[in-house]
Amino acid sequence: MKINQFGTQSVNPYQKNYDKQAVQKTVAQPQDKIEISSQAKEMQHASDAVTGSRQEKIAQLKAQIENGSYKVDANHIAKNMINFYKKQ
């Protein structure tokens, strides 16, 4: 009667393949990259300029409201609303 050698290699013969695949997966993962075009950068600068002027306008309106000098022109608002809905 012949008894074959019994070891851990024959218990899990797929372990070698699994280990190789794990190494390949960790090596093969690419890094993410972000590239911003010059046109997008120009748009960002333009947006920043508009935001700055808008902040100034908001500060002026807040000051007028606190002083009580802010007046609402109902006719102007109504005309703008009518023009807005006519365009749609």
From Swiss-Prot:
Gene3D superfamilies: Anti-sigma-28 factor FlgM
GO molecular function: sigma factor antagonist activity
UniProt keyword Plastid, yes or no: no
Keywords noted in UniProt: Bacterial flagellum biogenesis, Repressor, Transcription, Transcription regulation
Pfam entry (one): FlgM
Record's keyword annotation contains Transcription: yes
Superkingdom as given in the UniProt entry: Bacteria
GO biological processes: bacterial-type flagellum organization
Stored InterPro entries: Anti-sigma-28_factor_FlgM_sf (IPR035890), FlgM (IPR007412), FlgM_C (IPR031316)
Family affiliation: Belongs to the FlgM family.
Role played: Allows the coupling of early and late flagellar synthesis through the repression of RNA polymerase sigma-D factor-dependent transcription.
Protein name (record): Negative regulator of flagellin synthesis
Name of the coding gene: flgM
